């Protein structure tokens, strides 16, 4: 098995990111270079999971731009019962699958090779809803605007929407009653947590 692992990760240039909390704390994730792929910095990840609560026990999460897997694996490490990670780039998706295998993640993690909008559209038609939805798309490609009409059908009523973008997001108009309840900035990256208006203060 060790030989197989080295053969897979030895086939392209690798970057690494470390899981910072939970069951897999300090475990290293390996991933290839890809256009638009930017792992969420440790400090930002720590802030996000402080917002969500360190223990995600029993929650379901959907990461539509999984990339390095930093956020999706972190959610699973912190107890999420189900994490669906969507990635379109074949090499990046293959690295996610290999990292999941090395972590012995089992049924908690589902890696999907697909276009984010097409997958979200097909998923919304099934009635599936998630407690946490993560959007960290490549910049300046209009992904958030294209996905916005689908988001209300993918999130539970009391769910949380986490967005990273190159600009601040207070609301997403096509989502209706969603607005930012937490926000921060790290360099040129704006990150925010949005919830339905009627759940503010809950």
Each model region followed by its residue ranges:
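Class I S-adenosyl-L-methionine-dependent methyltransferase catalytic core
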Residues: 1-202
């Amino acid at each position: 098995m060790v030989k197989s692992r080295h053969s897979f990760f030895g086939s392209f240039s690798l970057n690494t990111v470390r899981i910072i909390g939970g069951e897999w704390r300090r475990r290293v994730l390996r991933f290839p270079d890809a256009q638009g792929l930017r792992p969420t910095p440790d400090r930002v990840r720590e802030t996000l999971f402080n917002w969500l609560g360190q223990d995600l026990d029993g929650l379901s999460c959907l990461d539509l731009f999984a990339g390095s897997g930093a956020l999706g694996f972190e959610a699973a490490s912190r107890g999420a019962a189900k994490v669906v990670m969507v990635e379109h780039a074949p090499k990046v998706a293959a690295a996610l699958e290999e990292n999941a295998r090395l972590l012995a993640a089992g049924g908690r993690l589902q890696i999907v090779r697909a276009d984010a909008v097409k997958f979200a559209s097909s998923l919304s038609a099934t009635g599936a809803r998630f407690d946490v939805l993560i959007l960290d798309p490549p910049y300046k490609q209009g992904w958030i605007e294209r996905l916005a009409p689908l988001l209300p059908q993918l999130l539970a009523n009391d769910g949380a929407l986490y967005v990273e973008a190159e600009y601040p997001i207070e609301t997403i108009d096509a989502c209706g009653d969603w607005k930012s309840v937490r926000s921060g900035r790290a360099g040129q990256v704006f990150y925010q947590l949005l919830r339905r208006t009627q759940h503010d203060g809950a």
